[in-house]
Design a protein with these regions (language model features):
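Basic- and aromatic-enriched surface patches that contact anionic nucleotides/nucleic acids
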Residues: 53-129
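Short alpha-helix boundary/capping and kink motifs at helix termini
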Residues: 2-57, 61, 67, 72
């Protein structure tokens, strides 16, 4: 038996209106998802809205692949998140990451080193507070 999930209202939006909550994309993952990202209908992104921002919670790689293929819009749906995401967005903005075109594409090894290092340090800092 298949599990049923609640229906989500999808909204089509310009990809450059979306604020990333990450800083990097993994080159290997970009190459992998590029094979199935061919139109805006192939990209559905969970988001939250805060003030004037529309924040990407997941799907940064799909979003990046779409932008590389010249896809201008994707579909999004509202969901919920934990408080930490706002810290990640603040750090992204500090790094001048305001939209998908600002994400840094890194090799798999560099991605794991950079992203996991940031996350580990974030967790350590939060535990120390």
């Amino acid at each position: 038996m298949l599990k049923e999930f609640p229906h989500k209202n999808l909204i089509e939006i310009d990809i450059f209106e979306l604020q990333p909550s990450q800083f990097f994309v993994n080159e290997d993952k970009v190459n992998a998802v590029s094979s199935f990202v061919n139109s805006s209908k192939d990209v559905v992104i969970p988001i939250i809205k805060k003030d004037e921002m529309i924040i990407v919670l997941d799907g940064h790689t799909r979003l990046y692949a779409a932008s590389m293929k010249g896809i201008k819009t994707v579909f999004v749906f509202d969901t919920e998140t934990e408080q930490y995401i706002y810290d990640f967005v603040q750090e992204a903005q500090r790094r001048n990451i305001k939209n998908v075109s600002d994400l840094k594409r890194l090799s798999h090894e560099d991605y794991e080193k950079e992203w996991y290092s940031y996350c580990d340090n974030y967790i350590k800092d939060k535990k120390g507070e």
